[in-house]
């Protein structure tokens, strides 16, 4: 019965109470540690947004599980990627959390639906004793409150999850919490009557409308007064201008103003930004395959060159593909230099370097060609992709490159068949399994990059996107360092 006006909406036996009564819910008041899975949280945020719009006339923004109002929640997950953003004068970090509980069977399933976006102040992370460069790949306890408008988590505290046992215990508690939250919250009429009587006793000389919160009449609702009705026309203009300025610097900027849910366009950034010779795509720390149109544009502008070679990295990539196509296990330095395809790559790179020279110190084109060839070969040797059979005869062993590429193809094929979204490639494992003691993380990255490009081209209906991050848990010289592969599948395939 709603004789006290304490129910905002009722569906069968489930009552959605007015906000004033939320404090009597143990999950809202903080007496219970509310643990939630990432998949459940993302679903509940979408449902809660509809509940607040339909049942509370958009005068409330609250996370609900059934009719339980929830404030601070507790999750455990692995940080998959992060991004830095300045909002006003404060620097924030937006990271994505995954605990493998999101439903991948949804139509149009994307990585944004799989991962939970979390927002935290950079200064706060430092105050908790965490190293920002080591965040990616870590499993953390995350505490915070849900933001329905932006469908993200406002982080209040982070701490490390130190063991698998700790993570398993969290999962057990969360499963039990699930069952408890599935039981609707209810307050008896007797309790409601007592609360109503207490309200009258606290302010006996005040009228019913004045005694309560402006959002309620008695214990029920009263339409809140709009702030706009209290402002002048000039103040309204100033307010609109301020909103415009805030929107410009907001990371939630969206061209669709009809919907209050703004999606943050997320890019993954490697935490090791000083990694030499990796050239992780546009951002400098990440490898991606979304620059096809840019490559076509450069190819058109450089049509007079035999091969489009904008820099040493692209030239090295082209040389590596040429070596993979050779039907031989070894080749001499002189024979390699005489190959038509290699000459084309070297000539194009030398042309590029020739145009970049300082007028005061000019080298001949022939000398630049020889230097470019030596530099490209030395880079592959230093990465362990090709070996020197004999220093006197300068014969190159091509088996390391071929074996690693074959391993990369098989590894990516397995990940795709299992529909895995991430995969780890450890340097020490590759060195031992393939008997390549001189292979480096740089070399592994370059080979997997080319293999992923080829796979996406062969199976565009399956593999939608991919990117590579460095494994942040170890330094580059550490034998246990490696890379993280991220795969995003097409909606029809997933």
UniProtKB/Swiss-Prot annotation:
Matching Gene3D superfamilies: 2.40.50.1040, Stn1, C-terminal wHTH domain, Stn1, N-terminal wHTH domain
Disulfide feature: none
GO CC field: chromosome, telomeric region; CST complex
Keyword presence, Magnesium: no
Compartment(s) of residence: Chromosome, Telomere
GO molecular function: single-stranded telomeric DNA binding; translation elongation factor binding
Residue spans crossing the bilayer: none
Start-end of DNA-binding region: 62-159
Domain of life: Eukaryota
Transmembrane helix in keyword set: no
Ranges for region Winged helix-turn-helix (wHTH) 2: 396-494
Keywords per UniProt: Chromosome, Telomere
GO biological process per UniProt: negative regulation of telomere maintenance via telomerase; regulation of telomere maintenance via telomerase; telomere capping
Region (Winged helix-turn-helix (wHTH) 1): 311-397
InterPro entries found in the cross-reference section: Stn1_C_fungi, Stn1_C_sf, Stn1_N
Pfam family, one: Stn1
Domain notes: The C-terminal wHLH region seems to mediate telomere-specific function.
Record text on subunit structure and interactions: Interacts with CDC13 and TEN1.
Protein purpose: Has a role in telomere length regulation and telomere end protection. Acts as an inhibitor of telomerase loading through its interaction with CDC13.
The protein's name: Protein STN1
Organism the protein comes from: Saccharomyces cerevisiae (strain ATCC 204508 / S288c)
Taxonomic path: Eukaryota, Fungi, Dikarya, Ascomycota, Saccharomycotina
